[in-house]
Amino acid sequence: METIVLAVEPRTCSKNEAKTLRTEGKVPAVVYHNGEDNQHICVNELALEKLVHSPESHIINLEFPDGKNRRSLIKDVQFDPVTDKVIHADFQFFSAGEVLEMEVPVTFTGKGPGIEAGGRLQALVHALTVKGVPSSIPDHITLDISAMELGETMHIKEIPAEIAAGKFEFVGEPETPVVSITAPRVEAEKTEEEEPESTEE
């Protein structure tokens, strides 16, 4: 998984601070780690937006003004309901060798018999939760659907073992559906309206 450096600054949590930060193009955030006090920080809005909307997961190397760097993951993001801009973020520090849970984006590849028969790929999830050491977790997971038949669904328990390769494990119910090949939509035939018969008086 790629490591991205993100410069951060401490903040005071004073009244109206969040509003002031946003006018300066910054987003308030908090960083936490088990056994440590939470740290209140702010980050550049554009840099954070780029990370949040990236199609891949990243390890975030938070860079503080005193020169210290701490590895972290984005754990939660809040969006403005009107503008859809990021208005707050939670980061989690982690230590070397620490096992964490995180979401990893999913992509699909292949064109199997189900697609050849006119079926549609229906992605039922856009990310999967996995558990492992962050350095062993991929930035995205690609699932091959080239063997899937029309009407077939792949569940978490059916993801090939070589995807994780013993480096991480999937979290969630084994029966959770991930992707389906659905039947093509059949358009109903249009019927011509019959003109009412005219009667002679």
UniProtKB/Swiss-Prot annotation:
Residues 179-201 are annotated as: Disordered. CDD domains: Ribosomal_L25_TL5_CTC. GO terms for cellular component: cytosolic large ribosomal subunit. GO terms for molecular function: 5S rRNA binding; structural constituent of ribosome. It comes from the Bacteria. Pfam families: Ribosomal_L25p (PF01386), Ribosomal_TL5_C (PF14693). The lineage of its organism: Bacteria, Pseudomonadati, Chlorobiota, Chlorobiia, Chlorobiales. Signal peptide: none annotated. This is Large ribosomal subunit protein bL25. Keywords: Ribonucleoprotein, Ribosomal protein, RNA-binding, rRNA-binding. One of its GO terms (biological process) is translation. Belongs to the bacterial ribosomal protein bL25 family. CTC subfamily. The keyword Ligase does not apply. Residues 190-201 have a biased composition (Acidic residues). This is one of the proteins that binds to the 5S RNA in the ribosome where it forms part of the central protuberance.
